Amino acid sequence: MGGDGPDRRQGEGQLRHHGQAEIEAPRVLEAARALAAGGLVLLPTETVYGLGADASNPAAVAAIFEAKGRPRFNPLIAHVHDVETAARIAAFDDRALALAAAFWPGPLTIVAPIRDPAAVCDLARAGLDTVAIRVPGHPLSRAVLAAFGGAVVAPSANRSGRPSPTTFADAVAETGDKAAVALDGGPCAVGLESTVVAVLDGPVRLLRPGAVTRAQLEAVVGPLAPADDDAKRSPGRLALHYAPDAPVRIDADAPRAGEAFLAFGAWPDGQGVFNLSPTGDLAEAAANLFAFLRAADRTQPAGIAVAPIPDEGLGEAINDRLRRAAGFVG
């Protein structure tokens, strides 16, 4: 078992998560058993909280779609414990293996031809001949995956179209009543969904920007091609997605009357102001984005204005989520 899994040196029945609170090993086993029985599990990852189910069980996968109100043409990402398991499920070429070596465990999803259709059922793949798969970087989720042994589909634990939950409280508020087991792994370190790339015939295509940036990917596989027709192979591509109840206005220099404001960089504190990063740090802004959208929405504003975010590095992923929250992507 890898170093991110259970630490047997810590004493019987305990796991340590990110150096924070100790997590009881029986809870990990309880989650694995719930998955094996066809139940849903609220699961932390480094990106966002997920609502997980056995990827091979069509009834369990259908329960996720029902819990989220998610369109069934939208494929789900399969999560596995290690690259060896991923390579048994998906057909990886040298480029996919290089990406896995560079970025796993971590926030990168690879779309590749399906090798073992029984491991990730047709419903989870939206009837496609490909599978979206990743090895998450959160020790608690990897411990559950190792105990379960198979693939777990785990879309964000929110109602479809809403901002993804990056705290346990927000995840429980969204879909906690649907889960047989709910695991608290603390705030999500990354705060944005994984980057998604398609590694099929032709050049590697960027289907969804995320925490692994374009520059980091191109350092491994060379120039990336646009998504084109392969966009349907990735989740998170709906025109209106990640949206709070209040309308979102992006690239705003200042809030209008009645609007909450998501600032970036130097901006005075004030009522209804939520600063994604006072220092202009894109990683901090990404980690805060969904939580601050939710916090702003709870003030019941006339709208939520968002300051301009540099469209470079991690900013590409932040702006993708903001454009979809505002309904500007078709």
Task: Go through the PLM ranges and name each one.
Residues G13-G330:
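Active-site-adjacent structural elements in enzyme catalytic cores
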